[in-house]
Swiss-Prot record:
Pfam families: NusB. It comes from Hamiltonella defensa subsp. Acyrthosiphon pisum (strain 5AT). The lineage of its organism: Bacteria, Pseudomonadati, Pseudomonadota, Gammaproteobacteria, Enterobacterales. GO terms for cellular component: cytosol. This is Transcription antitermination protein NusB. It comes from the Bacteria. GO terms for biological process: DNA-templated transcription termination; transcription antitermination. CDD domains: Terminator_NusB. Disulfide bonds: none annotated.
Length: 151
């Protein structure tokens, strides 16, 4: 695993999620268009596809997962904040191979790169609260099997 390739993949995921959220086109169309039109050199394309399609297929659950940790209404979030938080929630909830501190740091950097002035601070606050709880639930799920409730 190349960390810079993962970072570039996350940047591409945020951009593709933004395009998907704004256009409301089919995620497969967005993916193909993005891969054809955007600069993806240096990105881990397999990771890009996995995360992009994973977020899109589980978006309602990811939004529900993040909502208790938001300091404002979900509808008030900007599209970039939504994209970054959805990506981070997916990694926290589905990718135990990615340390939660890496997920948080990467999301903060994405907020600095793509978000409004203080987006990275908001993202940091949400993920600092959410990460330990979500990862604990993930541990319980992996110990008990996928069909046991953790709530």
């Amino acid at each position: 695993m190349n960390p810079s390739a993962r970072r570039r993949a996350r940047e591409c995921v945020v951009q593709a999620l933004y395009a998907w959220q704004v256009s409301q086109n089919d995620i497969a169309e967005v993916e193909l268009s993005f891969l054809a039109d955007q600069e993806t050199q240096g990105a881990d394309i397999a990771y890009f596809r996995h995360v992009l399609l994973g977020v899109a297929s589980d978006v309602e659950a990811l939004d529900t997962l993040m909502t208790p940790y938001l300091s404002r209404q979900f509808q008030e979030l900007g599209q970039i904040e939504k994209a970054i938080l959805r990506l981070a929630m997916f990694e926290l909830n589905k990718r135990d191979d990615v340390p939660y501190k890496v997920t948080i740091n990467e999301a903060i950097e994405l907020g600095k790169t793509f978000g409004a002035d203080d987006s990275h601070k908001f993202i940091n606050g949400v993920l600092d609260k959410a990460a330990p709880i979500i990862r604990k639930r993930m541990q319980i799920r992996s110990q008990n099997g996928p069909y046991q409730s953790v709530c």
